Amino acid sequence: MDPNTPADFFKGSSKFHTYYSQTKKGGGVIDLGLSLRTIQHETYLPPARMIGLDGYGELIDWSQPSYNSITQLKSEDTGHQRLAQGYYNNEGESRGKYAYVKVNLDGLVVGRKVCLVDQGAYATLALQLNDMFGMQTVSGLRLFQTESEFSLVYRDREGIWRNVGDVPWKEFVESVDRMRIARRNDALLPF
């Protein structure tokens, strides 16, 4: 303990009585080392003398951007503004329950969900799926490449399994229900 600390520093606070014990001889404090929290000293200035927030009114009055403006900026950056506006209403809530689609990799028990509104094309979808599942394979997924051992298939709302990339992106996003990353030799088998 700091020798400059007054001996009655811990006397006034009842919250330290279980962690510190005073001796009868010297009136000093023995640290029992039982505290798991840090000691927070009182403020040096009383509340009446606190420093004002003059000049910081602009920061305090600054409003957070709305969800719609963020969605619009995001969709303008990726080039799929119309698609993003179709999935969100004015309150920012998802209108379509198919904005998030579950993706499973053969051999893994747990699947993951992907937001198709955040993707602008098949290439960005393949990159995100490679980031999610690529570490589970020796050579990565390499989806949509001829030398890949994996194929990406999807089930549409009618329950028919199809190859991803056979239809235009917008039609794919509107009809997809679930996706599966299958080994190429397994992709030929009926589901």
UniProtKB/Swiss-Prot annotation:
- Which keywords describe this protein according to UniProt? Auxin signaling pathway, Nucleus, Repressor, Transcription, Transcription regulation
**Induction record:** By auxin.
Q: Report if keyword Transcription regulation is assigned.
A: yes
Query: Which residues does the UniProt record annotate as the domain PB1?
Result: 98-184
Q: Which terms under GO biological process does the entry name? A: auxin-activated signaling pathway; embryo development ending in seed dormancy; pollen development; response to auxin
Listed InterPro entries: AUX/IAA_dom, AUX_IAA, PB1-like
Domain of life of the organism encoding this protein:
Eukaryota
GO CC list: nucleus
One Pfam assignment? AUX_IAA
Location in or out of the cell: Nucleus
Q: Where is this motif: EAR-like (transcriptional repression)?
A: 32-36
- UniProt note: domains: The N-terminal half of the protein contains two conserved domains I and II. Domain I includes a slightly degenerated ERF-associated amphiphilic repression (EAR) motif which seems to be involved in the activity of transcriptional repression. Domain II is required for the correct degradation of the protein through the SCF-mediated ubiquitin-proteasome pathway. Interactions between Aux/IAA proteins and auxin response factors (ARFs) occur through their C-terminal dimerization domains III and IV.
Its job: Aux/IAA proteins are short-lived transcriptional factors that function as repressors of early auxin response genes at low auxin concentrations. Repression is thought to result from the interaction with auxin response factors (ARFs), proteins that bind to the auxin-responsive promoter element (AuxRE). Formation of heterodimers with ARF proteins may alter their ability to modulate early auxin response genes expression.
The record's subunit annotation is:
Homodimers and heterodimers.
Q: Which family does it belong to?
A: Belongs to the Aux/IAA family.
Q: What is this protein called?
A: Auxin-responsive protein IAA32
Source organism per entry reads Arabidopsis thaliana
